[in-house]
Regions:
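N-terminal Rossmann-like NAD(P) cofactor-binding subdomain of oxidoreductases
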Residues: 1-206, 247-249, 313-314, 318-324, ...
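Charged docking surfaces used in two-component/phosphorelay signaling
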Residues: 77, 169-357
């Protein structure tokens, strides 16, 4: 087992070899080092690999009960794993007294588990009766800081969101599927006839509900009641929890797009009173975790290829609604792996560490 570097707290990264885990390890190298030990944990098939963490080679441990040995109060385990893995193994960490930060859906609906975006509701981290703090999905995280700031200024009454989601949200399988499909259609004239892209891509569309190259797929998640997708309903529920608006009307349409990294969202937000777009821009410019890129005359607005690899959510295209003086239209982009997951997890873990500093 990797020895502690100092007397500081332990940070265990569960799922260290996955897509988000890789981003989180890079992120740790550029943030303040508050950890005495960074412990890497992954599935047994990844055990024994050595990964660089803050310039040091660290061996990956297999996810077993023993992986959390020596952890206790003041230590944190970050889970970047599927929901079933988090549900199975998070109690092994909390049983030792450590806190858990989980980025999966396993605990997001549990009223005993706070759902936290540090820029919006950091104070909720302290109220964790199960010893667990959940992070939202990457779509909710992308818009949370902007919505939180605007809600504090104007009072949010209604929200309509369309998300345009990157392939990497489905992990490495999503990225690899999109790259494979692009290779099959690159240099062709496909896309002008019914079925030509489907024939080129074949029946294996990876984790997506249809071919993604040269296409968009208006579906993410499983089927829920009324024709909604499970992810659309999850985003609605998470937004309500984070903003503490349990009755907020929220309508979400999730669309899968052929982008590798970076979610985009088109939002229409209605508030308690009239909204001035100029003042709203100032509010967002002052909001933590948000950068405003909003000069269409100069060709400056958020795009996923620009937001990829950056910490903040990018907001732009701010417009007062033409039909409702109380509504604001705007566009947000954020790196789904970094801003939408790894950064949220690290910031939350740092908040927990600060309680014991």
């Amino acid at each position: 087992m990797t020895p502690a570097r100092s007397s500081g707290p332990v940070l265990a990264v569960v799922g260290a070899t996955g897509a988000v885990g890789s981003v989180l390890l890079q992120l740790l190298s550029v943030r303040a080092d508050v950890w005495g030990e960074i412990r890497l944990i992954a599935s047994p098939r990844s055990a024994g690999r050595r990964l660089a963490v803050r310039g040091e080679e660290t061996e990956v441990l297999a996810l077993t009960e023993d992986a959390f040995d020596g952890m206790g109060r003041g230590d944190t385990a970050v889970f970047l794993t599927p929901a079933d893995v988090s549900a199975r193994w998070a109690p092994a960490a909390t049983a030792r007294g450590a806190a858990v930060v989980d980025q999966s859906a396993a605990f997001r609906e549990d009223p005993r588990v706070p759902l936290v975006v540090p820029e919006v509701n950091a104070e909720d981290v302290r109220e964790r009766p199960r010893g667990i703090v959940a992070g939202p999905d990457c779509v909710t995280a992308a818009m949370a800081a902007a919505l939180g700031a605007l809600h504090a200024e104007y009072g949010l009454r209604d929200l309509t969101v369309s998300s345009y989601q990157a392939a990497s949200a489905a992990g490495r399988a999503g990225s690899e599927a999109l790259r494979r499909q692009i290779s099959l259609v690159a240099g062709t004239s496909l896309g002008g006839m019914t079925g030509d892209v489907r024939r080129a891509v074949g029946e294996d569309t990876g984790p997506f509900a249809g071919p993604l190259a040269l296409n968009v797929v208006p579906w993410c998640g499983g089927l829920a009641a009324g024709g909604w997708s499970t992810q659309e309903l999850a985003i609605r529920a998470q937004t309500r929890r984070i903003l503490r608006l349990p009755a907020l009307p929220v309508a979400v349409t999730c669309v899968q797009v052929p982008v590798m990294t970076g979610h985009s969202l088109s939002l229409r937000a209605r508030f308690d009173g009239a909204v001035d777009a100029g003042r709203a821009r100032e509010v967002l410019q002052a909001a933590p975790g948000v950068v405003v890129v909003d000069d269409p005359a100069a060709g400056e607005f958020p795009t996923p290829v620009d937001a990829a690899g950056t910490d903040p959510a990018w907001a732009g295209r701010l417009r007062a609604s033409l039909d409702d003086p109380c509504s604001l239209e705007f566009f947000v982009c954020a790196d789904n792996l970094l801003h939408g997951s790894a950064l949220n997890a690290v910031q939350t873990a740092e908040l927990i560490a600060a309680e014991f500093a």
